[in-house]
C-alpha cells in the first residue's frame, strides 16, 4: 500500500460557443448603408453599422444610453461616455458624471474624426453600448433596410462551453473547479467552471423529463476555429491527496459487517478491518492498515 492522489470525475455533454447572444437594435431614422461581416469582431470606437453613411460606433459599458447627452446633463450615462472618450484618446475634460463644455469639445472632436455632423451632443441612437468587444453572430437586416428595430445579433468574443447539467449532479460542481474539454477532433483543452446556474429548467422529450441547471465552463488554448461544436466536459468533482488506497477488488465484506482487506505478511495472511473513504480510478481510500503493507487482490 502506498499513498496516492484519488480524483473523481464526471463527464457530461456540452456545447462550445461564444456565450449568450444579444440583439443590437437601431433607434434612429434613415437607411442601413453598411453592415459588418458575420463572424467579425468589433472593438471600442469602431462602427457596428452605418445609417445614411454615418457610423454607429461601439462604446463599452453596462448602461444603454436613453436620453440626449448635452451641456449640463448629469448621470452615470455621462460618465460612460466620458470614460470611453478618454480611452479613445480624447482629453481636456474630467471623467465624472457631469457633461461640461469640455465634454462637448471632446465630443465635437470625436464626431469630426468619425466624419459625422459636429453637434457636440450624443443621441441614444448614435452609438451602440456593450460590455466589451463583440462578435457579429448573425445579421438581422439587409443593406438598404430602414434603420429601426433589430440590426444584428452579437455575442462576446470569448469562447466558452455551456452544459445543461442534471440537477442530481449539481452538488458535484462549483465555481472555480477544473475541467477538461474534449473537442470533436479528439483534442483536449483545459477549462474551469465559470458559473453554476441558480434556476432549474425542465425539459420533456417523449416520455422522459429532465431537470437541469446551466453550467458555464471557460476554456483556454483553443487553436481550432470552431464557432460552435458539441464537446465532452470532464469535471474534477472531488480530489483527495496523499491518501492510502488499494484496488477496489481488494475489499472484502467481513462477517461482522463492514469491509476489510487481506494483508500478506511473508508466507502468512490475515484479515484487517478498514474504514473506506473515496472511490475513484478503480481504487478506494482506506484507513486501518499501515503504509507499506501488502494486500492481496483476489483474481
Regions found by a protein language model. Give the residues of each.
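Long, charged alpha-helical "stalk" segments
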Residues: 37-90
Amino acid at each position: 500500500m502506498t499513498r496516492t492522489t484519488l480524483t473523481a470525475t464526471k463527464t457530461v455533454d456540452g456545447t462550445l460557443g461564444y456565450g449568450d447572444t444579444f440583439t443590437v437594435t437601431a433607434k434612429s431614422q434613415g437607411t442601413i448603408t453598411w453592415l459588418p461581416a458575420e463572424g467579425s469582431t468589433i472593438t471600442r470606437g469602431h462602427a457596428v453599422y452605418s445609417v445614411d453613411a454615418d457610423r454607429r460606433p461601439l462604446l463599452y459599458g453596462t448602461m444603454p444610453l436613453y436620453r440626449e447627452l448635452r451641456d449640463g446633463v448629469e448621470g452615470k450615462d455621462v460618465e460612460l461616455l466620458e470614460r470611453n472618450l478618454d480611452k479613445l484618446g480624447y482629453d481636456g475634460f474630467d471623467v465624472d458624471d457631469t457633461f461640461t463644455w469640455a465634454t462637448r469639445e471632446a465630443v465635437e472632436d470625436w464626431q469630426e474624426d468619425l466624419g459625422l455632423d459636429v453637434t457636440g451632443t450624443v443621441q441614444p441612437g448614435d452609438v451602440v453600448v456593450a460590455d466589451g468587444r463583440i462578435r457579429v453572430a448573425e445579421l438581422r437586416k439587409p443593406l438598404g433596410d430602414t434603420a429601426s428595430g433589430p440590426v444584428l445579433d452579437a455575442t462576446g468574443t470569448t469562447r466558452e462551453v455551456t452544459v445543461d447539467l442534471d440537477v442530481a449532479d449539481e452538488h458535484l460542481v462549483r465555481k472555480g473547479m477544473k475541467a477538461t474539454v474534449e473537442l470533436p477532433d479528439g483534442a483536449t483543452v483545459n477549462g474551469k467552471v465559470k458559473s453554476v446556474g441558480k434556476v432549474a429548467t425542465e425539459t420533456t422529450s417523449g416520455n422522459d423529463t429532465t431537470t437541469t441547471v446551466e453550467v458555464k465552463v471557460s476554456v483556454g488554448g483553443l487553436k481550432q476555429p470552431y464557432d460552435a461544436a458539441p464537446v465532452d466536459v470532464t469535471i474534477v468533482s472531488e480530489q483527495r491527496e496523499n491518501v492510502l488506497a488499494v484496488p477496489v477488488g481488494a475489499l472484502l465484506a467481513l462477517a461482522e459487517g463492514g469491509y476489510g482487506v487481506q494483508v500478506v505478511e511473508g508466507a502468512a495472511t490475515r484479515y484487517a478491518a478498514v474504514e473506506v473513504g473515496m472511490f475513484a480510478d478503480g481504487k478506494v481510500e482506506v484507513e486501518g492498515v499501515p503504509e507499506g503493507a501488502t494486500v492481496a487482490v483476489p483474481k
